């Protein structure tokens, strides 16, 4: 197999306690789904379900059938653990209740 038939990519998956990052060569025309399987990430992180997890390349969402190119970093995204709007409301409420100057600013309407 000629080197020209191969592309160098990396596969990344982050957990709260660790990161899986592997750089390797795959054949041209390999899809994101095939690259994930080839990386071995599912043996290290068994919670990954390719049929339900969202994937992307450098922070841009892609479909699993997208073909990878040289230099791509395939990212596997975890589901959100908290609703961002609800988390912000809780932070604001906590700041308001703290009695600090910043908390008082929230109560006065930002002045």
From Swiss-Prot:
InterPro entries: Mopterin_synth/thiamin_S_b, RnfH, RnfH_sf. Residues 94-105 have a biased composition (Basic and acidic residues). It comes from the Bacteria. Residues 88-111 are annotated as: Disordered. Gene3D superfamilies: RnfH-like. It holds the Pfam family Ub-RnfH. Belongs to the UPF0125 (RnfH) family. This is Protein RnfH. The gene is rnfH.
């Amino acid at each position: 197999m000629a080197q020209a038939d191969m592309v160098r990519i990396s596969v990344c998956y982050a957990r709260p306690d660790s990161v899986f990052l592997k750089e390797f060569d795959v054949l041209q025309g390999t899809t994101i789904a095939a690259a994930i399987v080839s990386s071995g990430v599912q043996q290290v992180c068994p919670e990954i379900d390719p049929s339900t997890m969202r994937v992307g390349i450098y922070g841009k969402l892609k479909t699993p059938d997208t073909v990878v190119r040289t230099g791509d970093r395939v990212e596997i995204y975890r589901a959100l653990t908290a609703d961002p709007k609800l988390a912000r409301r809780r932070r604001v409420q906590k700041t308001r209740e703290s009695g600090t100057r910043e908390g008082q600013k929230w109560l006065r309407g930002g002045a």
